[in-house]
Amino acid sequence: MTFGLLVAGNRSLMLTDASGRHGVMASAKSEAEVSSDAKKEMRAYKEGMTLREPRFMDFIQEFDSPWSVTMSTIWPNLIVQREMNTLGIRQIVPNGPHEFVMKWTMFGFEGDDAEMTRHRLRQGNLMGPAGFLGLEDNEAMKFVQDGMRRVPDKRHLVKLDPAHEAGTSDTLISESAIRAMYKHWRREMGL
């Protein structure tokens, strides 16, 4: 939200297959101005905060898709992400009972010219392992992990959008897709 990628009013959805196994989060970056009411609802929004390098946010339309951000959950520890003009894989590798390492792989394409390569590298500094947004995601995962350690029976219900049990949602302000994925995962693990 801080940089206008995922804001109220963006066209967004969380899409899952019937089993919950496959899920995609998608959002279309809007060029519209965010309303003052929407700004009040965004905890991460900082009035007047700008990037010194505005090209971080340049989105070059590379193919016919309405989405500027897609995140595909392959398994609880593997996500394929396309954010703006970056393509990457995030893999969580358990490193002990209460520890993990986040591994990132960012991609370029053989047909990229030098300017597009620079652009992808630049955006990788926003979305990638040491990027402004990547660090925030890693911290969020740490909070979840720390929270789960305090749950006595090791079961936890994610409550964002509790009225929608599990599956597809037309908003990013929902965790119904992640609930569907974990229902599938628990079946696969025999839990």
Q: Which residues fall in each region the model found?
A:
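C-terminal catalytic domain of Rieske-type non-heme iron oxygenases
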Residues: 1-191
